[in-house]
């Protein structure tokens, strides 16, 4: 686990999603730990039509790997304003660069205070060690 990357400028959920907040918008993806546990990602289902809403701790999609299928839970609430269309044809971007090219959604925050419910990188690392 020591070789896994968890950037300090992001926030993390207990369900292994990350959030990058920029003003009133947030980018969402899954952590390096999550993609490592899943193995090779072969398919992802996201709300491809922007303008849908997501709610904190509720399902926003599914991710399928050679090992398993898992639900994606939103770490924050808001309106989807952008979806990473590249993941339709190349879901392996999530394995290759989970914090860069492997991002999933950009959301306009509806409740910025929810960010306070998420963990810092150090808190997330400690959480993973306690699993």
Report each predicted region and the residues it spans.
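Acidic, low-complexity mobile loops and tails
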Residues: 1-59, 92, 96-131
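Charged, amphipathic alpha-helical coiled-coil/dimerization segments
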Residues: 77, 81-82, 89, 95
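Short glycine/proline-centered loop/turn elements that form peptide/ligand docking sites
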Residues: 49, 67-68
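Residue-level recognition of beta-strand microenvironments
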Residues: 19-21, 66, 83-86, 112
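Short coil-to-beta-strand transition motifs
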Residues: 9-13, 71-77
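Short connector loops at helix/strand junctions that flank enzyme active sites
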Residues: 67, 73-75, 100-102
């Amino acid at each position: 686990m020591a070789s896994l990357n968890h950037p300090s400028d992001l926030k993390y959920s207990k369900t292994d999603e990350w959030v990058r907040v920029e003003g009133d918008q947030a980018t969402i993806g899954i952590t390096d730990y999550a993609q490592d546990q899943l193995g090779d990602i072969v398919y992802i289902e996201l709300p491809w039509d922007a303008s849908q809403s997501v709610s904190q701790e509720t399902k926003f999609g599914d991710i399928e790997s050679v090992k398993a299928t898992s639900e994606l839970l939103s770490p924050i609430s808001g309106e989807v304003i952008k979806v990473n269309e590249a993941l339709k044809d190349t879901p392996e971007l999530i394995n290759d660069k989970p914090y860069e090219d492997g991002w999933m959604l950009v959301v306009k925050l509806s409740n910025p205070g929810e960010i306070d419910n998420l963990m810092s990188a150090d808190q997330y690392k400690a959480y993973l060690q306690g699993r």
